[in-house]
Amino acid sequence: IAFYDLDWAFQTRSNCFFNLIGSEQTAQIAPTIRWLFGIDDFKERLLTRYAELTETTLSDEHVTEKIDGFRALLAPEIARERAHWGGSEEGWNEQVDALRANIADDYAAHTVRNLCDALGVGEEERMEYFGF
């Protein structure tokens, strides 16, 4: 399944959803997702790959490191950016802090549970793929 609008998806837990199969609001995505689930081993491959990603690229630790790195990279430019577009450096820092806190609070496990719920994966099968 494709990532989209990652700043929105990572910002709050309520934005972490997988309702792409039947929602009429996502009609451009739903046919593709339905087609993929028609492939015999797609669900297994999806769960296996997501398990790998939540241990590496999408792990809470890795994502918070990326947030910290981008914060350090962008911090010198924020005063100029806010002067042009409005807002304050303090407001920017508050948003970055909120994003970081959301990820640091076991976000990967939250996404795993949402994904498993959406796919009808029970606790035993979730344990096999994700270890919890």
Which residues fall in each region the model found?
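Middle-to-C-terminal accessory/interaction subdomains
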Residues: 1-132
